[in-house]
Design a protein with these regions (language model features):
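Short tryptophan-centered beta-strand motifs in secreted/extracellular beta-sheet-rich domains
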Residues: 137-143
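Non-catalytic linker/capping segments at the edges of enzyme domains
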Residues: 1-89, 109, 114, 127-131, ...
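Short nucleic-acid-contacting surface segments enriched for D/E, G, S/T with interspersed K/R
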Residues: 95, 130-137
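Conserved short alpha-helical segments that host acidic/polar catalytic motifs at enzyme active sites
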Residues: 102, 108-109, 114-125
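Compact, glycine-rich, soluble single-domain proteins
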Residues: 86-88, 96-104
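Short connector loops at helix/strand junctions that flank enzyme active sites
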Residues: 47, 64, 119-121, 136
Length: 182
């Protein structure tokens, strides 16, 4: 296999960039956006959004940061074939994972180094579902607090919408980045 050199991003000001395309997200899943050993998104099919439409520094419920992303629903998405047969619905844990993914992406965007991991969630409520009839899933994150030290942590609340209707709410998510010991 050929050696792939990752681009250097030390001088890139990600905080001036407010939107990210699907191509950007795929680059992030390969470790090409924020640099080697920094926050990565999972690759498709586990990448749970197509684009990030907004990252806003002053906004959201806590007047810190807010992040919005979207996923266009296609009837042939892989999970509809198996969850459940003759009763297709997107697994609720995938919506939660999307919110964790988005919070982890935010830490990379903020310049926090290290690999991202979900550390927990306080409360999850499911009030609806995502079926093949849904056209667009929207994700919204409100960042409550960020700690930037040897391990960086983001604390956030989130919400998932199916065609504009709230279907999941999440409180007290914790996502962090850490530099693995060698």
């Amino acid at each position: 296999m050929a050696d792939i050199s990752l681009p250097k991003h030390e001088n890139v000001d990600f905080q001036s960039k407010k939107t990210f395309s699907n191509k950007d997200l795929i680059e992030c899943s390969r470790g090409l956006l924020f640099g080697e050993n920094n926050a990565q998104l999972p690759a498709p099919p586990m990448l749970m959004f197509d684009s990030i439409s907004n990252i806003e520094k002053e906004g959201g419920s806590f007047n810190k940061w807010q992040i919005d992303a979207e996923l266009a629903i296609k009837k042939d998405l892989w999970f509809f074939d198996c969850h459940f047969i003759n009763d297709p619905v997107m697994p609720g844990c995938f919506g939660l994972d999307a919110l964790w993914q988005l919070t982890g992406f935010f830490l990379g965007w903020l310049g926090c180094s290290g690999r991202g991991r979900a550390f927990g969630v306080g409360e999850v409520k499911f009030t609806g579902q995502i079926t093949p009839e849904v056209k667009l899933v929207s994700y919204h994150i409100d960042i409550k607090r960020v700690i930037k030290r040897q391990v960086s942590l983001a604390f956030s609340d989130g919400e998932v919408f199916a065609d504009g209707e709230s279907v999941y709410t999440v409180k007290n998510m914790k996502v962090g980045t850490f530099v693995p010991e060698e």
